[in-house]
Amino acid sequence: MATVPEIKIMRSESLGHRSDVSSPEAKLGMRVEDLWDEQKPQLSPNEKLNACFESIPVSAFPLSSDSQDIEIRSDTSLAEAVQTLSKFKVLSAPVVDVDAPEDASWIDRYIGIVEFPGIVVWLLHQLEPPSPRSPAVAASNGFSHDFTTDVLDNGDSAVTSGNFFEVLTSSELYKNTKVRDISGTFRWAPFLALQKENSFLTMLLLLSKYKMKSIPVVDLGVAKIENIITQSGVIHMLAECAGLLWFEDWGIKTLSEVGLPIMSKDHIIKIYEDEPVLQAFKLMRRKRIGGIPVIERNSEKPVGNISLRDVQFLLTAPEIYHDYRSITTKNFLVSVREHLEKCGDTSAPIMSGVIACTKNHTLKELILMLDAEKIHRIYVVDDFGNLEGLITLRDIIARLVHEPSGYFGDFFDGVMPLPENYRV
């Protein structure tokens, strides 16, 4: 039986060094190296990096193998969309408008990006009490009147019981809801995209200061997305640059030297292992965060991590919770790990347990670990394993560049970053 893994403290001696200078990311790093050598000596290291990244177009960023050619039609059911995102292990995918004309431009061809945060919004909306309370309303959604009454009468205990998600995922509502029906949860309207000639600096600032997790790159002459650059992709690029002068000059700094972690233990949103798993997703939605640590009640030590992408395991494998009277965060973690072990998928981030570091680790060590483990956050602990802080991919990218005064100008004109009903 799977158990909750112990905290894994990052050890610098186990990280190794990059040696594949032929990778596209390493070649890109060497391009930065050449530009670094050309910068004026009076510039600070941060100013040099800004100048280097401003000189490189985003078209030079290696194509993403994870998200290439993964598009979802607007008439795809939500159930199929969840299966697609889960199958290809991606957090999001662009949605193609099936009603768009064949000669449509890219901005008319796509209606947005569907992502797990939006799916969480939809899921939690289904758990709100239906109104009016009638058999007809329940039947129209594909639920039995008895099941709806149970949810109303028993509240959270009903929606966290082991069979709730089996009923939900077999309902007509889940099967018939289309991706276009949840377009109000899309992060951008339709979404913010970069043109191929935009700079790396623009891209890095959007992924850090402006909190975008992924950015489509488009060619105005082509009605198709050319590439999708993610925070994880940038971290992988940086990991491939280990050994290069500019990277070593920046990466040798310790976390405490660069002001990390930004978020201290008193401000971390957390959940205890005996609380309902849906409470974790509610907290992530309410606080607009991508993940949350699961804490042991007695010791206050982190024993796991639940991220927004993990909602897929409630919807793609609801049968694994059938025997539980209540799906707590601990039950959820144990069940998902057992399920993935049986499926032979031991590389999923949820299998890693708690990956942690200390304030004495360097940026380079942190980047190599995040890239190796394919995770989006790392917890900072003290010598006794107690939680001290949290560092995300965005925090690291934000330490790489800074925004010059007036840099974006009218770049955001006409863009709607967050729809009114977007709550993640």
UniProtKB/Swiss-Prot annotation:
What is the protein's species of origin? Arabidopsis thaliana (Mouse-ear cress)
Protein purpose:
Regulatory subunit of the probable trimeric SNF1-related protein kinase (SnRK) complex, which may play a role in a signal transduction cascade regulating gene expression and carbohydrate metabolism in higher plants. The SnRK complex may also be involved in the regulation of fatty acid synthesis by phosphorylation of acetyl-CoA carboxylase and in assimilation of nitrogen by phosphorylating nitrate reductase.
- Keywords associated with the record: Acetylation, ATP-binding, Carbohydrate metabolism, CBS domain, Fatty acid biosynthesis, Fatty acid metabolism, Lipid biosynthesis, Lipid metabolism, Mitochondrion, Nitrate assimilation, Nucleotide-binding, Phosphoprotein, Repeat, Ubl conjugation
Question: This chain belongs to which protein, by name?
Answer: SNF1-related protein kinase regulatory subunit gamma-1
Residue numbers carrying N-acetylalanine: A2
User: What InterPro entries does its record include?
Assistant: AMPK_gamma/SDS23_families (IPR050511), CBS_dom (IPR000644), CBS_dom_sf (IPR046342)
Q: Which gene encodes it?
A: KING1
What turns on expression? Strongly induced in the dark.
Record note on quaternary structure: Subunit of a probable heterotrimeric complex consisting of an alpha catalytic (KIN10 or KIN11) subunit, and a beta (KINB) and a gamma (KING or SNF4) non-catalytic regulatory subunits. Interacts with HXK1 in mitochondrion.
